[in-house]
Amino acid sequence: MEALVYTFLLVSTLGIIFFAIFFREPPKVPTKKMK
């Protein structure tokens, strides 16, 4: 069970870092052109 907890913590940490960078530097590509 500990492995599952460590995996969850790792994924959550990477997610927080990803969103922090994503919101700090908004994509320059308009979202309307992506679709």
From Swiss-Prot:
Belongs to the PsbT family. This is Photosystem II reaction center protein T. Found at the monomer-monomer interface of the photosystem II (PS II) dimer, plays a role in assembly and dimerization of PSII. PSII is a light-driven water plastoquinone oxidoreductase, using light energy to abstract electrons from H(2)O, generating a proton gradient subsequently used for ATP formation. PSII is composed of 1 copy each of membrane proteins PsbA, PsbB, PsbC, PsbD, PsbE, PsbF, PsbH, PsbI, PsbJ, PsbK, PsbL, PsbM, PsbT, PsbY, PsbZ, Psb30/Ycf12, at least 3 peripheral proteins of the oxygen-evolving complex and a large number of cofactors. It forms dimeric complexes. GO terms for biological process: photosynthesis. One of its GO terms (cellular component) is photosystem II reaction center. InterPro entries: PSII_PsbT, PSII_PsbT_sf. It is a single-pass membrane protein.
